[in-house]
Regions:
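Cell-envelope and extracellular/periplasmic
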Residues: 26-480
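Bacterial Sec-dependent N-terminal signal peptides
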Residues: 1-27
Length: 480
């Protein structure tokens, strides 16, 4: 055997020895979500889980608990145990000990944990909005002062998978101008608003991908169980680099999170499903129901953002998708932030004002989830209509005082008779109702408000929150 052959044999033996050592002394391993700086949901029975050798005993000790928890890894090497968390507070530590290895997790806070998902408007970071030099410098000052030291950020690395994953890539970060700069702007403004109002730690898990449709974030099995949604199962984008196939982001970027106890979720998506407006309520019901089932913590809050005005190439598609999103409010424990007034540039599908978006989402959470009296949490919502001779009376909820209409309102309200021809309408305010009419329509049957792709708000409640676009008819609308 020559010198080169002897060297190769030695290398092989060393590699084999290392592999053998790792196999017989496999260290306890934790998922990415369980690590330094994490926020755990307060007053909850939370999961702590990971991997180890089959049959290996794992001990979990948390500094807020007087007793440890013990669990034995399954034959597949999985382990999971449940521990209880106290009221919000910290910092705490946690130690996970296996046969030959121990992991200490530090700087743990206990508070409120929220999942933040969707497509590009959730995925848009403060850096993507121009960075601190050009966007909300007053917020930068708050961060630099340390106002949000109890907020923690976790970004799920973008990935796709044809099969459900058990782990993702990412880590919990403390707040500074750098970490916030690279975080979802909508998620940040939502979480920082909660932090200010609740005065307790907040953990934000940001998992989003621009240009994606809702079916990509939904388990395929759930779509298969819904006969009306079969269209989405077989849809494929045709691009390996862009996730357009049903379930691939649920598998890689949602399912790995489902062991981690959350309080609820916020969602900013819809643009990529605008031509699916007829099926969108059923699709979102399936997505929300499947997520709630996967987490197994009941019907957790799910608050979402209605898409803003934009000059889509398909006529009325944006208005029809907004209508579909309104219908999603029939899903239990949901709420919707309206953005008809913050579009700015109708040629930009990404409104720059993410501050108000985050705050409006937080108003829903503070009111409905945390029981705080924040005043108004929603703009006017269309409730019912009544034909009264030559006019139509429109009734609203969430008016919070008298309705308000801007001077451009007459251009946003339209009224039609049985011929289905709409004309600009005159509008009068009567408390929580509007009376809509037109001299050109003697026998009105239907009213529409802001029902165009690019319509902006002209109707607000007493506190200045905008109403969603709506219509009283269900006539077929052309999108070509």
């Amino acid at each position: 055997m020559n010198k080169i052959q002897k060297t190769l044999v030695l290398v092989v033996l060393v590699i084999a020895g290392i592999f053998s050592f790792n196999q017989t002394n496999a260290a306890v391993r934790l998922p990415a979500l369980i690590g330094n700086n994490m926020v755990l949901q307060q007053n909850a029975a939370i999961n702590v889980w990971g991997w180890a050798d089959a049959g290996e005993k794992v001990i979990v000790q948390a500094s807020w608990l007087s007793a440890s928890a013990e669990v034995v890894a399954t034959k597949e090497g999985n382990w999971k145990t449940i521990i209880n968390t106290p009221n919000a507070g910290g910092p705490y530590t946690m130690t996970i000990t296996g046969r030959d290895y121990s992991i200490k997790i530090e700087n743990i806070l206990i508070g409120e944990v929220w999942l933040c998902s969707g497509q590009s408007n959730m995925d848009l970071t403060i850096k993507g909005l121009g960075g601190w030099g050009n966007y909300k410098p007053e917020v930068r000052d708050e961060v630099q002062r340390g106002d949000f030291a109890s907020v923690r950020l976790f970004t799920v690395q973008k990935d796709t998978s044809a099969y459900v994953r058990t782990d993702c890539k990412g880590n919990w970060l403390t707040v500074d101008t750098g970490t916030v700069d690279n975080f979802s702007a909508t998620a940040w403004f939502y979480g920082s608003s909660l932090s200010k109002k609740l005065g307790i730690p907040v953990g934000l898990i940001y998992t989003a991908w621009g240009g994606t449709a809702a079916e990509v974030w939904t388990p395929v099995a759930s779509l298969e169980a819904a006969p009306e949604l079969q269209h989405f199962i077989h849809h494929y984008s045709g691009y390996a680099w862009w996730p357009g196939t049903a379930g691939v982001l649920y598998n890689a970027m949602i399912h790995p999170l489902t062991n981690y106890t959350i309080k609820g979720a916020i969602w900013y998506q819809g643009e990529s499903n605008r031509m699916d407006y007829k099926l969108y309520p059923a699709l979102m019901n399936t997505l929300i129901t499947s997520w709630r089932k996967a987490w197994g913590i009941g019907d957790f809050p799910f608050y979402f953002v209605q898409i803003a005005p934009y000059l889509y190439k398909e006529r009325n598609s944006g208005a029809l998708l907004r209508e579909a999103q309104m219908k999603c409010l029939s899903i239990p424990n949901t709420g919707m932030a309206v953005t008809l007034d913050i579009a700015g540039d109708i040629n930009d599908i990404h409104p720059k004002n993410k501050l108000d978006v985050g705050i409006r989402l937080s108003l829903w959470a503070l009111t409905k989830t945390y029981g705080q009296d924040v005043g108004s949490f929603s703009g006017p919502v269309y409730k019912d209509f009544k034909v009264e001779k030559k006019s139509i009376s429109i009734e609203f909820i969430y008016t919070d005082g008298e309705l308000k209409i801007t001077e451009t309102a007459k251009n946003n309200f339209a009224i039609a008779g049985a011929d289905k021809v709409f004309y600009p309408a005159t509008v009068k305010i009567q408390g929580n109702k509007l009376v809509v009419s037109s001299k050109k329509v003697k026998h009105p049957v239907a009213v529409r408000y802001a029902f165009l792709n690019t319509s902006v708000s002209s109707l607000f409640n007493g506190t200045g929150l905008p109403a969603s676009s709506f219509r009283t008819d269900d006539w077929e609308i052309d999108t070509k």
